[in-house]
Amino acid sequence: MAVRTDIIIDVSIIIGANYGDEGKGRMSDYLANKAIQAGQFTITILSNGGAQRGHTVVLDNGFTHIFHHFGSGTLAVADTYLPQSFIVNPMIFMKEYNELLNSPLGRDTSLWPKIFVSPESLISTPFDMMNNQIIEEHRTHRHGSCG
């Protein structure tokens, strides 16, 4: 099998190392817009975690969305990939989906960017969250959790 050497791949990696509020959402949206305007295929890959993430994007027209499952490049029409290390919460996913129906993306979802989910991603349900809260409440040495 021949290896192609004529393909140029431009990859931008955004890493938060300050416990949040570093502008990861804003930077993802900016880079996605820049790449799409240049005619490049653009996909946002979420590395890990789940719906507790909250990456805020504010558009020039004032529209604001906090991304949980969809990548922060979604409003720029960048696709999203949720890998096996991402924990999907179907209820929060649908809530976010419904919020995005009223976004500048519009209600015609055939024009939306695609979202790909690894078949090995974990699923979190309200039962899981309730169970974790009960366990945490009864620990002798609590370590805290996201919800």
Segments and roles (model prediction):
Residues A2-G147:
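Non-transmembrane, aqueous-exposed alpha-helical and coiled segments at domain scale
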